[in-house]
Amino acid sequence: MADAQAAAAGKKKYKNKKNSAEKNPNHNPNSSGQVEAQTPSNGHVQHQEEEATEDQEPAQELRGLLKKMHLCNGHGHKEQEARPLGEVVNGHAHGHSNNNHIRCTSGSSNNNNSTHNNNSVDSSNNNRKQRREGGDGGGSDSNSLKPEEKPITATSKTTANIHPTTTTDPKPKVSEDVAVEQGVHVATGSGHSREQERKQPPSDYAEGATPTITAQLQLPEPAISADEIVYKEYEAEHQMHDIMRLIQAELSEPYSIYTYRYFIYNWPKLCFLASHDNQYVGAIVCKLDMHMNVRRGYIAMLAVRKEYRKLKIGTTLVTKAIEAMLADNADEVVLETEMRNQPALRLYENLGFVRDKRLFRYYLNGVDALRLKLWFR
């Protein structure tokens, strides 16, 4: 019974102390001999005022039980009000540590300084450095508030989210401006370097390529003049094989050796050759006989090597053959050529030949031919 009365008396006395503490929050606990609350392991600070006298063991046991009950529930003292939004966002207020979230209701600057750890110091240094870089020289640091400006409980006037909201807005702008300026410098630098690279290699290549080009221009090309070509008549049998190889290489229509012999043996004076450096580069084979009471000359074959064209070799050979036919009283000259052979058509038409007749599928390859004719009388 005595224990129950003592416990009730202690509980009543504790409630009175608690009510007086709530009414006078600025009351200094050191002046009344009360002991400051200990920081529990769950990260919340509880300030419980105990009496200086230790002779009342039941009261102490009751306070211990109440303290355990508060710890088990996960809540601190009623003095621990809800955190402001800025404190929750930033994780610290009034110099409190970011990791421990310690609140000091006593308002003592010494106690607040004792709750700082290395993390809060580092964060304050980083905030100062960022504000200096951002150009906010007049902004105050949220972790370095004056003692007289620090209230007992966290309020909206001294929360840490006020200063960051005013200082963090210009900081990204400044960083963006700096980044833009740096990007411009980098871009201009890369542009200059690229322009130099674009300008420099072509000059190097040009310098390296100039000697080659000049060397190629200085090389004497094997230019052959028309005066170097030698024209002669057919002379002997040993020229037969050279004529055959030349014509077979240039003409599409195959001829047997008997065809060559027919023309060359019967009209050797109407066969002319063009040579250069003792090599035959052109040949013409013709005939002249009676056709319907008319002496008709006929150009059977004309060939010039490709590398010796554009030297008027073909024109010269045809002219020599026509002159020989005229000397033998020829009345006309005829020939056939492919319709798609435009160089041959131009050659003969320039000499006075006209298109007389179209011969369908005249050649073995199925190509049509055009008959050209030149009249003397």
Swiss-Prot record:
Cysteines paired by S-S bonds: none
GO MF annotations, alphabetized: protein-N-terminal amino-acid acetyltransferase activity
Ranges annotated as biased composition (Low complexity): 90-127
Catalytic activity: N-terminal L-methionyl-L-leucyl-[protein] + acetyl-CoA = N-terminal N(alpha)-acetyl-L-methionyl-L-leucyl-[protein] + CoA + H(+); N-terminal L-methionyl-L-isoleucyl-[protein] + acetyl-CoA = N-terminal N(alpha)-acetyl-L-methionyl-L-isoleucyl-[protein] + CoA + H(+); N-terminal L-methionyl-L-phenylalanyl-[protein] + acetyl-CoA = N-terminal N(alpha)-acetyl-L-methionyl-L-phenylalanyl-[protein] + CoA + H(+); N-terminal L-methionyl-L-tryptophyl-[protein] + acetyl-CoA = N-terminal N(alpha)-acetyl-L-methionyl-L-tryptophyl-[protein] + CoA + H(+)
Compartments, record wording: Cytoplasm; Nucleus
SUPFAM superfamilies documented for this protein: Acyl-CoA N-acyltransferases (Nat)
Null mutant phenotype: Flies are viable but display a 'held out' wing phenotype, characterized by the abnormal positioning of the wings, a typical feature of muscular defects. Flies also show male sterility, reduced longevity and age-dependent loss of motility due to developmental muscle defects.
The entry's keywords: Acyltransferase, Cytoplasm, Nucleus, Transferase
Basic and acidic residues bias (residue ranges): 192-201
Name of the molecule in the record: N-alpha-acetyltransferase 30A
UniProt-listed InterPro entries: Acyl_CoA_acyltransferase (IPR016181), GNAT_dom (IPR000182), NAA30-like (IPR044542)
One family name in Pfam for this protein: Acetyltransf_1
Residues in N-acetyltransferase domain copies: 229-377
CDD domains recorded: NAT_SF
Function of the molecule: Catalytic subunit of the N-terminal acetyltransferase C (NatC) complex. Catalyzes acetylation of the N-terminal methionine residues of peptides beginning with Met-Leu-Ala and Met-Leu-Gly.
Oligomer and partners: Component of the N-terminal acetyltransferase C (NatC) complex, which is composed of Naa35, Sbat/Naa38 and Naa30A.
Source organism phylogeny: Eukaryota, Metazoa, Ecdysozoa, Arthropoda, Hexapoda
Family (UniProt): Belongs to the acetyltransferase family. MAK3 subfamily.
Annotated Polar residues bias: 26-45, 153-169
Region (Disordered): 1-208
One Gene Ontology cellular component: nucleus
Entry EC number(s): 2.3.1.256
Enzyme class: transferase
Source organism: Drosophila melanogaster (Fruit fly)
